[in-house]
Amino acid sequence: MWALAFVLAKIGIFAGVIAGAGGVLALGGYHNGSRAAHTRLLSYSLLGAFIGFHSSLAPVLIQAGQINDAGVMGMFDSDLVLLLRGTPVWESAAFRGAGFALSALLTLSLLRTLRAQRKPPDSVFYRLAFIGQALALGLVAYGFTLSGHVSVLDAWLRAALAFHVAAMAIWLGMLLPLRWCCDDVESGGLGELMRRFGRLGIGLVAALASSGVFMLLNLIDIIELFTTEYGRLILFKLGAFVGLLAIAALNKLRHVPVLHLPGGSRALARSIDRELVVAMALLLVTAVVTTLFGPATH
C-alpha cells in the first residue's frame, strides 16, 4: 500500500512539473496568439502546479503513515509529521512545494492580468512569466536532489539530476501545447512553429542524454544493466526514450515537411498523440524505478 502511494505521489510530481513548465514556456509563440490560447496554456500550467504542490506534500504524510503503522489515519498524526522536519523527505517536499506554490501564484497573477487587459500581452507579461517559471522550475528540480540515492552523492551528480529534471519538464511539457497547435494554427504557421521547436528540442535532448549518461555511469556498473532488476528497468526506460526520439525524428523529417498538404496537420497530430503515450509510459517507469529501486552499489 505505502509503496504504491509513494509511486503515485512521484507520478503526480512529474505530471505537475511537466505541465507547470510546459504551459508557461509555450506562451513563447507556441499558440495561435488568441486570448483563449493564452488562457488554456496558463490553465494547463496552473493545473500542473496544483497537482504538483499536493503531490509534493504527500510523501511526508505517507512517510508518517508508514512509520505510524495505523493505516490512512496515521498519515495525519501531526506530532509525527513534525518529527520528520529536517529529514530528506521533508526538505525535498519543502523545496518542491515552494516551487509549485510559486508557479501557482505566477499563473494566477498572469491569468488575472490577461483578463484585465483588452490589448494583447506586452513583453513585460512574457518576461515575468518566463523568469518566474524558471525560478519555480529551479526550486522543484533542486528538490529532487535532496532525497533518494542521489542525495548522498557529490554535487556534480546532484546538479546533473536537477539539469535532467528541468530538461525533461520542458521537453515533455511542450508536447500537449504542440498537439493543440495542430488544431488551432494554420499549416504555414504550424510548420514554422514545429521547425522552431525542433531546434529547441535538439538542445533539450542533448541536455537529457548527457546528464542521463553522466548519472548512469556514476551510479551503476554496465553489467548491472543486465543482471539486476534496477538495471533492466533502466534499460526499459532507455528504450522508451529512444522511442520518443524516433517519433520526434519522424515528425521532423516526415510530417512537418508535408504540413501544407491535405491531412498533413492531422497526421502530425496523430504522431504527437503516440509521442504522448510513450512519454506517459516513460514517466511511469521512471516513477517506479526512482521510488522502489536503487543501484546495488549505492
Regions found by a protein language model. Give the residues of each.
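Polytopic transmembrane helical bundles with strong interfacial aromatic enrichment
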Residues: 1-298
